[in-house]
């Protein structure tokens, strides 16, 4: 190699070394940059995670009685829940098949609101929505709409759409229906990475154990502890308590008349699969009973591995709603009502009371309008509502009807004290005013209603007229007052208008001159509680309390207070609220009290000799049906308060087909006895002893009774003495069953002026 060639090699080597040095320098600098300057950024990328938040449902608040005993509570239950986040790449339909088979093996059901039945032999489907059910038809329309189908779409069209959307073509028809229904339910619950799907609810412990045992091979299938509404005594005021239920599609998605869609419940923090109060106090106090949901956060890495879970927000239970009702007293009144109806059936089982099988009682405190008891007969058991709904809704005795608040009845002679108050206060009569009674009212030439003259005749004053329920006296006073005047007083006393209770109640009505069938004679009929006037038992009790309070009417109410569930602290309390006042001139209310105090002496039975003075007024209004030509069935009505001179409680009673109002006298005494036992503390002990004895008897019967027989007949109450003879449609219309299973008000027929009730030989000191 010559010198020139050597120089060339050296230069090339130097170039290579320089180039290599530059590359090494760049590499070193890059390493320094990665390790020191931007290490945090790359470390974050290497450990990239995503947080997913899931709702943890808060426990619903309890409903307790005035003594703090639980009536409605949340008990622990278990749901089968699917987490899309945790399922990963699992075959969803294969997993669903496996879960369904497991649930079926344990006798469980899963959530499926698709209104389509199993395919027939030809492979065609049919809708299961009831044609006469408004809720079913709304749900059916919503289902078609959510699937993008026209309203004329058939069940086959719906299934074809589901099979296509969820690629179920390879499955047999049965499994297409099962999986299609579950997918539809998932769609309704918005199943996603951030929203789990509740597949089955309140499953058994055996099912819980089986799923947990298979957890490794069933990723994303979880058992979630939740709460279920339960009732310690399911037959205590079920109509008033109401119930909870699932959020319906119509309530979740609301479309107004302009086509605008909103999600009001979602905006309030609800999830589609939440339970919500749908009727009664459960619905009215939803905001108080519903707790504040918690949040559980699940952290997942970029490669799908769950790296952490944390309860980021602890759920807070709902508040406790405390009622004015004492459960022991309520049960005592329930039993007393059933006993009274059974007595009428066994003793007076023909004529005007041949079909006595239903009734209601309301007892309220005269001091503040708080409801102490609200009884319906027949009734039902809250704990059996879901499983026995079909039986309850078809029962001719209408156990779902809240007669105490929504039953409307002609008041009969219980209305007479209102007319007396109006006449005395307006100056039409005074203590010494009299009306001559000879048994026939002769003011009109072409209309001469009668009086049965049970124990009076001649010149009758207001006290005697109330005592003996003299129709002639009230015909004449009512005619002179006119319905405009005595109606105004009746309204202020609490009749024909809302009492103010927190839950749904019927308004009723009074007879007015604007009525289409109004005549002058209707004024005199309405003055004795006939005509078009209809009121509810809770209005009768409120009215009796207002008479007892000398014209001061309080708002009637069921809720005593709202309590903090954890501490018991009173958060809010219902204060006595005066709704109306009749000042009452002179001795108006005292004269009415004197007349009502003498009524018990005209009634056979325990009430006539009861040691505590009772002020009462019976009523025997006619029903439209007759049991013989010219002979009408009769209801038995009663208003009472006691002790008469220092009132503590007021009572309103209605017994359908009860025959005569006087037949409720023993019922008033039984209620009074229970009340005084409540006051001295013995009632709770007695109730507990009776409960233990009843449980022991049931255990004995369970050992000897055929299970099939034991499963039959769940209606609370004697269904009844003669269920086949119950025909409420004649005067008390059978309710159209609401979507939520809550009966609507029963309203009596409007009646033309009728001849006065004739004396019946089977009556206990009969009166009108």
Q: Where would I find each of the regions flagged by the language model?
A:
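Amphipathic, well-packed alpha-helical segments that form the structural scaffold of globular domains
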Residues: 286, 290-293, 303-304, 334-342, ...
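Structural motif corresponding to the C-terminal cap of alpha-helices
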Residues: 336-348, 427, 600
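Long, low-complexity, intrinsically disordered segments
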Residues: 718-768
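Beta-lactam-recognizing serine transpeptidase/beta-lactamase-like catalytic domain environment
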Residues: 72, 78, 299-316, 325, ...
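Membrane-proximal periplasmic segments of bacterial cell-envelope enzymes
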Residues: 1-314, 350, 354-360, 700, ...
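Intrinsically disordered, low-complexity mixed-charge segments
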Residues: 678-719
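Solvent-exposed, polar/charged alpha-helical surfaces in well-ordered, non-transmembrane soluble domains
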Residues: 93-101, 209, 213, 238-242, ...
């Amino acid at each position: 190699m010559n010198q020139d060639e050597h120089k060339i090699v050296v230069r090339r080597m130097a170039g290579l070394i320089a180039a290599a040095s530059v590359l090494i320098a760049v590499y070193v600098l890059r390493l320094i940059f990665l390790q020191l300057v931007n290490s945090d950024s790359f470390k974050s990328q290497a450990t990239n995670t995503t947080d997913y938040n899931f709702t943890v449902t808060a426990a619903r608040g309890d409903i307790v009685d005035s003594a703090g005993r639980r009536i409605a509570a949340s008990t622990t239950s278990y749901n089968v829940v699917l987490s899309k986040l945790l399922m990963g790449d699992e075959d969803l339909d294969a997993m669903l098949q496996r879960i369904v088979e497991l649930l079926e093996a344990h006798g469980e059901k899963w959530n499926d609101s698709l209104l389509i039945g199993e395919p027939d032999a030809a492979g065609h489907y049919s809708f299961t929505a009831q044609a006469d059910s408004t809720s079913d038809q709304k749900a059916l329309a919503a289902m078609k709409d959510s699937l993008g189908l026209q309203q004329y779409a058939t069940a086959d069209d719906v299934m074809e759409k589901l099979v296509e959307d969820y690629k179920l073509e390879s499955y047999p028809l049965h499994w297409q229906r099962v999986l299609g229904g579950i997918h539809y339910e998932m769609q309704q619950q918005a199943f996603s990475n951030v929203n789990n799907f509740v597949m089955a609810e309140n499953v058994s412990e055996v099912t819980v154990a089986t799923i947990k045992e298979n957890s490794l091979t069933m990723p994303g299938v979880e058992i979630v502890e939740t709460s279920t509404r339960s009732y310690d005594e399911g037959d205590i005021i079920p109509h008033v308590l109401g119930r909870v239920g699932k959020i319906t599609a119509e309530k979740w998605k609301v479309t107004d008349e302009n086509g605008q869609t909103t999600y009001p419940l979602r905006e309030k923090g609800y999830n589609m699969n939440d339970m919500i109060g749908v009727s009664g106090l459960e619905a009215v106090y939803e905001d108080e009973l519903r707790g504040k949901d918690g949040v559980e956060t699940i952290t997942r890495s970029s490669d799908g591995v769950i790296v952490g879970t944390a309860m980021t927000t602890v759920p807070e239970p709902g508040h406790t709603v405390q009622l004015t009702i004492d459960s022991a007293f309520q049960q005592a009144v329930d039993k007393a009502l059933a006993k009274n109806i059974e007595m009428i059936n066994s003793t007076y089982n023909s004529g005007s009371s041949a079909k006595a099988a239903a009734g209601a009682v309301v007892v309220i405190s005269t001091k503040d309008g708080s409801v102490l008891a609200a009884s319906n007969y027949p009734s039902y058991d809250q704990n059996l509502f879901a499983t026995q709904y079909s039986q309850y809704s078809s029962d001719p005795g209408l156990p779902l009807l809240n007669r105490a608040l929504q039953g409307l009845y002609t008041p009969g002679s219980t209305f007479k004290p209102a007319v007396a108050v109006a006449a005395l206060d307006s100056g039409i009569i005074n203590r010494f005013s009299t009306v001559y009674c000879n048994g026939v009212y002769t003011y009109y030439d072409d209309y001469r209603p009668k009086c049965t003259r049970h124990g009076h005749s001649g010149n009758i004053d207001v006290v005697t007229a109330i005592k003996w329920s003299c129709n002639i006296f009230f015909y004449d006073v009512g005619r002179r007052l006119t319905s405009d005047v005595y109606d105004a007083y009746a309204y202020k006393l609490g009749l024909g208008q809302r009492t103010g209770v927190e839950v749904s109640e019927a308004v009723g009505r009074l007879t007015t001159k604007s009525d289409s069938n109004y005549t002058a004679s209707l004024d005199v009929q309405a003055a004795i509680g006939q005509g078009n006037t209809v009121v509810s038992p809770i209005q009768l009790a409120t009215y009796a309390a207002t008479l007892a309070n000398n014209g001061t009417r309080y708002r009637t109410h069921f809720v005593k207070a709202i309590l903090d569930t954890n501490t018991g602290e009173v958060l809010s309390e219902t204060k006595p609220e005066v709704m109306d006042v009749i000042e009452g001139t002179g001795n108006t209310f005292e004269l009415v009290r004197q007349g009502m105090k003498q009524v018990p002496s005209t009634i056979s039975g325990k009430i006539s000799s009861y040691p505590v003075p009772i002020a009462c007024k019976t009523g025997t209004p006619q029903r439209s049906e007759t049991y013989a030509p010219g002979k009408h069935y009769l209801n038995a009505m009663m208003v009472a308060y006691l002790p008469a001179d220092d009132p503590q409680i007021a009572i309103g009673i209605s017994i359908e087909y009860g025959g005569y109002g006087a037949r409720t006298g023993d019922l008033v005494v039984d209620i009074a006895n229970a009340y005084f036992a409540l006051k001295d503390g013995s009632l709770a002990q007695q109730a507990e002893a009776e409960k233990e004895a009843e449980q022991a008897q049931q255990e004995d019967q369970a050992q000897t009774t055929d299970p099939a027989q034991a499963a039959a007949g769940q209606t609370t109450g004697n269904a009844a003495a003669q269920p086949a003879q119950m025909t409420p449609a004649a005067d008390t219309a059978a309710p159209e069953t609401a979507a939520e299973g809550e009966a609507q008000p029963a309203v009596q027929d409007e009646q033309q002026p009728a001849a006065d009730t004739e004396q019946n030989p089977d009556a206990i000191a009969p009166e009108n």
